[in-house]
Amino acid sequence: MKKHRYSATNIKQADWKQIGVRTAGERVVLGVDVAKDEFFGVLMGEDLAVSATLKWKHPEQTRALGAHLIEEVHADRLEVAMEPSGTYGDALYRHLSELGIPIYRVSPKRVHDAAEVYDGVPSLHDAKSAYIIARLHRDGGSSLWEAIPEQRRNRKALIAELDLYQDQQQRNLNRLEALLNRHWPEAVRVMELKRVSLLCVLAEYGDPATITAHSEAAWELMRHSGRGLLSAETIEQLLACAQDTLGVPCTAGERHLLRVLAEELLRTHRQIKRIEAQIDQEVHQDALLTRLAAVTGKTTSLVLEAALGSPLDYPNPHSYLKAMGLNLKERSSGKHKGQLKITKRGPGIVRKYQYFTALRWLY
């Protein structure tokens, strides 16, 4: 098996005149290994010969790379193949696409699995990864990288914003629960921690002693914030346990912290409600999402469309299932022989919301 050398030259020092001669009249692919700062690329011809192994600083030298590719690579057709490595390659994708260069994507899993295929060495590093990407593209292991439509990008951003606030909410609920179990343990037994009425009274007064000192105002605040859904008996029970709590009395700083946590939870609650209203509107205006929502729920239907695109774009239901990472794989040998497990490939957020859908069906 042929060994390869993977030493790379910065695009500033590369002999572009010689590269132009080597690539003239050929169909050339630039395989790109994407990183945070230093990108690597391999220019490969139709005969699989490497014209150059390059490296450049991104984004400082990315425009210069594009200029070299357009002006000094004299190929009949130039293509670029790269991994969809999170968001790090998106700016390069945009720049080269605007220059009219077709971009292809190669699965990171394929690159990983091919580590030993071409040189017999089971290692991966930047320049070698770029070579493997170019080679896989030559072998038909890539697909055209199509730009995501603006509407879908907006929906992905909306779901990411919802996930951000839900994560903040859960973290702060955990913090608040820990503090209340120290200072007012009875409260979390009387009411759910994320009830707006409880959060409102905590945001206003902070600790049970201050709530007791302003019991009449606290009663009115809870009745108003509960919007008629909170019974007088529950309010009386909460105020009674505030007066007779076993909790540790708060210092001024601890009382302030309780107020801050409650205020932050109320803020995230409002933001989540705002986003959920936007999701309702998005689903209502889209006939396909409306049909999906009847089965999965509105938020899950939007998650599926944002993460995977329209189910109508898939050739069959199994392909859609595979994109979710919910298709089954079976071990044919070893400790787990015969066991079926889901592959868990694709966006994890899809499986998270599909899990919620399954729970909704069960309960």
Which residues does each predicted region cover?
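A detector of single, family-specific signature residues
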Residues: 1-363
